[in-house]
Amino acid sequence: MAIHLYKTSTPSTRNRAVDSQVKSNPRNRLIYGLHCCSKGRNARGIITAGHRGGGHKRLYRKIDFRRNEKNIYGKIVTIEYDPNRNAYICLIHYGDGEKRYILHPRGAIIGDTIVSGTEVPIKMGNALPLTDMPLGTAIHNIEITFGKGGKLARAAGAVAKLIAKEGKSATLKLPSGEVRLISKNCSATVGQVGNVGVNQKSLGRAGSKCWLGKRPVVRGVVMNPVDHPHGGGEGRAPIGRKKPVTPWGYPALGRRSRKRKKYSDNLILRRRTK
Protein backbone atom coordinates (compact mmCIF):
# COMPACT_ATOMS: atom_id res chain seq x y z
CA MET A 1 0.00 0.00 0.00
CA ALA A 2 1.14 3.57 -0.74
CA ILE A 3 1.94 5.62 2.35
CA HIS A 4 1.38 9.37 2.05
CA LEU A 5 3.64 11.47 4.27
CA TYR A 6 2.41 14.97 5.08
CA LYS A 7 4.58 17.99 4.49
CA THR A 8 5.43 19.56 7.85
CA SER A 9 3.40 22.76 7.69
CA THR A 10 2.01 22.55 11.24
CA PRO A 11 3.03 20.61 14.37
CA SER A 12 0.08 18.24 13.88
CA THR A 13 1.25 17.16 10.42
CA ARG A 14 4.83 16.42 11.47
CA ASN A 15 5.55 12.70 10.86
CA ARG A 16 1.84 12.09 10.06
CA ALA A 17 1.27 9.20 7.64
CA VAL A 18 -1.89 7.86 5.98
CA ASP A 19 -2.65 5.15 3.43
CA SER A 20 -3.54 6.96 0.23
CA GLN A 21 -4.81 3.95 -1.76
CA VAL A 22 -7.04 2.18 0.78
CA LYS A 23 -10.61 3.49 0.76
CA SER A 24 -13.81 2.34 2.42
CA ASN A 25 -16.69 1.46 0.08
CA PRO A 26 -18.67 -1.25 1.91
CA ARG A 27 -21.42 -3.32 0.27
CA ASN A 28 -24.88 -2.86 1.76
CA ARG A 29 -25.54 -6.56 2.27
CA LEU A 30 -22.28 -7.05 4.14
CA ILE A 31 -22.66 -4.28 6.74
CA TYR A 32 -24.95 -3.44 9.61
CA GLY A 33 -25.16 -0.78 12.29
CA LEU A 34 -23.01 -1.15 15.37
CA HIS A 35 -24.29 0.58 18.49
CA CYS A 36 -21.41 0.76 20.96
CA CYS A 37 -22.68 2.50 24.05
CA SER A 38 -20.53 1.01 26.83
CA LYS A 39 -17.50 3.33 26.42
CA GLY A 40 -15.57 1.26 28.95
CA ARG A 41 -18.40 1.22 31.52
CA ASN A 42 -20.29 -1.72 32.96
CA ALA A 43 -24.05 -1.96 33.53
CA ARG A 44 -23.72 0.18 36.67
CA GLY A 45 -21.89 2.96 34.83
CA ILE A 46 -18.57 2.26 36.57
CA ILE A 47 -15.37 2.52 34.50
CA THR A 48 -13.96 -0.98 34.04
CA ALA A 49 -11.72 -0.24 31.01
CA GLY A 50 -10.02 3.13 30.96
CA HIS A 51 -9.23 5.53 28.14
CA ARG A 52 -12.26 4.61 26.01
CA GLY A 53 -15.00 6.86 24.74
CA GLY A 54 -16.08 9.05 21.86
CA GLY A 55 -14.94 8.03 18.41
CA HIS A 56 -16.53 8.27 15.00
CA LYS A 57 -19.66 6.35 14.03
CA ARG A 58 -18.96 2.95 12.51
CA LEU A 59 -20.68 0.34 10.39
CA TYR A 60 -19.70 -3.24 11.14
CA ARG A 61 -18.42 -5.32 8.21
CA LYS A 62 -19.41 -8.99 8.24
CA ILE A 63 -16.11 -10.86 8.01
CA ASP A 64 -16.05 -14.49 6.88
CA PHE A 65 -13.90 -16.12 9.55
CA ARG A 66 -15.29 -19.60 8.84
CA ARG A 67 -14.22 -19.78 5.16
CA ASN A 68 -16.87 -22.45 4.50
CA GLU A 69 -17.18 -21.88 0.74
CA LYS A 70 -15.48 -25.20 0.05
CA ASN A 71 -13.65 -25.86 -3.23
CA ILE A 72 -15.13 -22.75 -4.89
CA TYR A 73 -12.59 -20.31 -6.27
CA GLY A 74 -12.97 -16.64 -5.42
CA LYS A 75 -11.39 -13.48 -6.79
CA ILE A 76 -10.15 -10.49 -4.79
CA VAL A 77 -12.10 -7.50 -6.10
CA THR A 78 -11.23 -4.74 -3.62
CA ILE A 79 -8.95 -4.08 -0.65
CA GLU A 80 -10.75 -1.84 1.85
CA TYR A 81 -10.27 -0.08 5.16
CA ASP A 82 -12.19 -1.47 8.13
CA PRO A 83 -12.77 0.95 11.05
CA ASN A 84 -13.37 -1.97 13.44
CA ARG A 85 -9.86 -3.51 13.21
CA ASN A 86 -6.27 -2.66 12.33
CA ALA A 87 -6.12 -5.13 9.46
CA TYR A 88 -7.48 -4.40 6.00
CA ILE A 89 -10.24 -6.53 4.47
CA CYS A 90 -10.78 -7.96 0.98
CA LEU A 91 -14.04 -8.31 -0.91
CA ILE A 92 -14.20 -11.75 -2.54
CA HIS A 93 -16.44 -12.67 -5.48
CA TYR A 94 -16.89 -16.46 -5.56
CA GLY A 95 -17.72 -18.48 -8.63
CA ASP A 96 -21.24 -19.29 -7.40
CA GLY A 97 -22.12 -15.60 -7.03
CA GLU A 98 -21.44 -15.34 -3.28
CA LYS A 99 -19.73 -12.16 -2.02
CA ARG A 100 -17.87 -12.08 1.28
CA TYR A 101 -15.25 -10.13 3.20
CA ILE A 102 -12.09 -11.81 4.49
CA LEU A 103 -8.98 -10.53 6.25
CA HIS A 104 -6.40 -9.19 3.81
CA PRO A 105 -3.38 -11.53 3.61
CA ARG A 106 -0.03 -9.79 3.36
CA GLY A 107 1.04 -9.49 -0.27
CA ALA A 108 -2.37 -10.23 -1.79
CA ILE A 109 -3.40 -7.88 -4.61
CA ILE A 110 -6.58 -7.24 -6.56
CA GLY A 111 -7.17 -10.01 -9.08
CA ASP A 112 -5.66 -12.85 -7.05
CA THR A 113 -7.71 -16.03 -6.63
CA ILE A 114 -8.24 -17.93 -3.38
CA VAL A 115 -9.97 -21.15 -2.39
CA SER A 116 -10.78 -23.06 0.78
CA GLY A 117 -11.21 -26.77 1.35
CA THR A 118 -9.19 -29.94 1.80
CA GLU A 119 -6.16 -30.70 -0.34
CA VAL A 120 -6.03 -27.21 -1.83
CA PRO A 121 -2.69 -25.63 -2.83
CA ILE A 122 -0.51 -24.20 -0.05
CA LYS A 123 -0.88 -20.65 -1.31
CA MET A 124 -1.26 -17.30 0.41
CA GLY A 125 -4.92 -16.68 1.27
CA ASN A 126 -6.08 -20.28 0.89
CA ALA A 127 -7.83 -21.90 3.87
CA LEU A 128 -7.47 -25.58 4.70
CA PRO A 129 -7.27 -27.92 7.72
CA LEU A 130 -4.04 -28.10 9.71
CA THR A 131 -3.71 -31.79 8.89
CA ASP A 132 -3.13 -30.92 5.21
CA MET A 133 -0.44 -28.30 5.88
CA PRO A 134 3.31 -29.02 5.92
CA LEU A 135 5.37 -28.20 8.99
CA GLY A 136 6.71 -24.66 9.14
CA THR A 137 3.73 -23.10 7.36
CA ALA A 138 2.93 -19.51 8.35
CA ILE A 139 -0.79 -19.19 9.09
CA HIS A 140 -3.42 -16.84 10.52
CA ASN A 141 -7.17 -16.83 11.33
CA ILE A 142 -6.88 -20.14 13.20
CA GLU A 143 -9.83 -22.05 14.60
CA ILE A 144 -9.80 -23.22 18.21
CA THR A 145 -12.95 -25.34 17.87
CA PHE A 146 -13.72 -27.12 14.62
CA GLY A 147 -16.34 -25.29 12.56
CA LYS A 148 -16.57 -22.24 14.84
CA GLY A 149 -14.45 -19.94 12.68
CA GLY A 150 -11.03 -18.42 13.16
CA LYS A 151 -10.25 -16.96 16.59
CA LEU A 152 -6.44 -16.69 16.77
CA ALA A 153 -3.93 -14.51 14.90
CA ARG A 154 -6.39 -12.07 13.34
CA ALA A 155 -4.77 -8.69 14.14
CA ALA A 156 -2.76 -6.68 11.63
CA GLY A 157 0.62 -8.33 11.03
CA ALA A 158 -0.26 -11.42 13.10
CA VAL A 159 1.19 -14.76 12.05
CA ALA A 160 1.49 -18.17 13.72
CA LYS A 161 3.66 -21.14 12.80
CA LEU A 162 2.83 -24.83 12.55
CA ILE A 163 5.73 -26.58 14.27
CA ALA A 164 4.54 -30.17 14.89
CA LYS A 165 1.75 -32.69 14.28
CA GLU A 166 1.21 -35.74 16.45
CA GLY A 167 -1.88 -37.89 16.91
CA LYS A 168 -5.04 -35.81 16.76
CA SER A 169 -3.34 -32.53 17.65
CA ALA A 170 -1.12 -29.96 15.98
CA THR A 171 1.37 -27.76 17.81
CA LEU A 172 1.34 -24.05 16.99
CA LYS A 173 3.54 -21.14 18.01
CA LEU A 174 1.25 -18.13 18.35
CA PRO A 175 2.19 -14.45 17.85
CA SER A 176 2.39 -13.97 21.64
CA GLY A 177 5.08 -16.66 21.89
CA GLU A 178 2.68 -19.18 23.42
CA VAL A 179 3.00 -22.77 22.23
CA ARG A 180 -0.25 -24.74 22.39
CA LEU A 181 -2.08 -27.74 20.98
CA ILE A 182 -5.04 -27.48 18.59
CA SER A 183 -7.04 -30.18 16.85
CA LYS A 184 -5.69 -31.05 13.41
CA ASN A 185 -9.22 -30.83 12.01
CA CYS A 186 -9.34 -27.08 12.68
CA SER A 187 -8.70 -24.89 9.66
CA ALA A 188 -6.48 -21.86 9.16
CA THR A 189 -5.52 -19.45 6.40
CA VAL A 190 -2.07 -19.57 4.82
CA GLY A 191 0.07 -16.45 5.15
CA GLN A 192 0.33 -13.40 7.38
CA VAL A 193 -2.28 -10.73 8.03
CA GLY A 194 -1.56 -7.55 6.08
CA ASN A 195 -0.92 -3.96 7.22
CA VAL A 196 2.17 -5.07 9.13
CA GLY A 197 3.52 -1.62 10.01
CA VAL A 198 0.35 -0.23 11.54
CA ASN A 199 1.96 0.14 14.99
CA GLN A 200 4.78 2.23 13.54
CA LYS A 201 2.49 4.71 11.78
CA SER A 202 2.30 8.11 13.45
CA LEU A 203 -1.18 9.60 13.85
CA GLY A 204 0.33 13.07 14.20
CA ARG A 205 -2.17 14.61 16.61
CA ALA A 206 -4.44 13.84 19.53
CA GLY A 207 -7.61 14.39 17.52
CA SER A 208 -6.82 11.43 15.27
CA LYS A 209 -6.55 9.26 18.36
CA CYS A 210 -9.94 10.51 19.57
CA TRP A 211 -11.54 9.53 16.24
CA LEU A 212 -10.53 5.95 17.05
CA GLY A 213 -12.40 6.07 20.37
CA LYS A 214 -9.26 6.33 22.52
CA ARG A 215 -9.22 9.01 25.21
CA PRO A 216 -6.18 10.60 26.89
CA VAL A 217 -4.10 8.58 29.36
CA VAL A 218 -3.57 10.33 32.71
CA ARG A 219 -0.90 9.36 35.25
CA GLY A 220 -2.17 8.18 38.60
CA VAL A 221 0.30 10.35 40.53
CA VAL A 222 -1.47 13.53 39.34
CA MET A 223 -4.92 12.29 40.39
CA ASN A 224 -6.72 12.71 43.69
CA PRO A 225 -6.57 9.94 46.31
CA VAL A 226 -10.21 9.09 45.60
CA ASP A 227 -9.34 8.28 41.98
CA HIS A 228 -6.04 6.41 42.27
CA PRO A 229 -3.82 4.93 45.03
CA HIS A 230 -0.90 7.02 43.69
CA GLY A 231 -2.84 10.28 43.99
CA GLY A 232 -2.69 13.03 46.58
CA GLY A 233 0.13 14.79 48.35
CA GLU A 234 1.43 18.35 48.28
CA GLY A 235 2.97 19.35 44.96
CA ARG A 236 5.01 16.69 43.24
CA ALA A 237 4.83 13.81 45.68
CA PRO A 238 6.00 10.19 45.29
CA ILE A 239 3.47 7.40 45.09
CA GLY A 240 3.97 6.48 48.75
CA ARG A 241 4.33 2.74 48.11
CA LYS A 242 7.12 0.26 47.55
CA LYS A 243 5.74 -0.74 44.15
CA PRO A 244 3.27 0.88 41.74
CA VAL A 245 -0.28 -0.45 41.65
CA THR A 246 -3.32 -0.23 39.39
CA PRO A 247 -6.32 2.00 40.19
CA TRP A 248 -7.81 -1.02 41.98
CA GLY A 249 -4.74 -1.71 44.13
CA TYR A 250 -3.29 -4.70 42.26
CA PRO A 251 0.44 -4.85 41.38
CA ALA A 252 0.97 -2.88 38.18
CA LEU A 253 4.23 -4.42 36.97
CA GLY A 254 3.05 -7.99 36.51
CA ARG A 255 0.18 -9.97 37.95
CA ARG A 256 -1.24 -13.21 36.64
CA SER A 257 -4.79 -12.54 35.50
CA ARG A 258 -5.57 -15.91 33.92
CA LYS A 259 -8.27 -17.95 35.62
CA ARG A 260 -6.94 -20.89 37.62
CA LYS A 261 -7.83 -24.41 36.46
CA LYS A 262 -9.03 -23.23 33.06
CA TYR A 263 -10.13 -25.93 30.62
CA SER A 264 -7.28 -25.17 28.19
CA ASP A 265 -4.43 -25.42 30.72
CA ASN A 266 -3.49 -28.89 29.49
CA LEU A 267 -3.29 -27.63 25.89
CA ILE A 268 -0.71 -24.92 26.60
CA LEU A 269 2.82 -26.26 26.39
CA ARG A 270 4.61 -22.96 26.99
CA ARG A 271 3.33 -19.68 28.40
CA ARG A 272 3.21 -16.58 26.29
CA THR A 273 6.17 -14.23 26.50
CA LYS A 274 4.40 -10.93 25.78
From Swiss-Prot:
Any one Gene Ontology BP term: mitochondrial translation
InterPro entries: NA-bd_OB-fold, Rib_uL2_dom2, Ribosomal_uL2, Ribosomal_uL2_bac/org-type, Ribosomal_uL2_C, Ribosomal_uL2_CS, Ribosomal_uL2_dom3, Ribosomal_uL2_RNA-bd_dom
A GO molecular-function annotation: transferase activity
SUPFAM superfamilies: Nucleic acid-binding proteins, Translation proteins SH3-like domain
Disordered, as annotated region: 225-274
One Pfam assignment: Ribosomal_L2
Gene Ontology CC entries for this record: chloroplast; mitochondrial large ribosomal subunit
The organism's place on the tree of life at top rank: Eukaryota
Subcellular location field: Plastid, Chloroplast
Keyword annotations of the record: Chloroplast, Plastid, Ribonucleoprotein, Ribosomal protein
SMART domains: Ribosomal_L2 (SM01383), Ribosomal_L2_C (SM01382)
Database matches in PROSITE patterns: RIBOSOMAL_L2
Quaternary assembly: Part of the 50S ribosomal subunit.
Family: Belongs to the universal ribosomal protein uL2 family.
Entries under HAMAP family matching the protein: Ribosomal_uL2_B
Protein name, entry field: Large ribosomal subunit protein uL2cz/uL2cy
Organism: Lotus japonicus
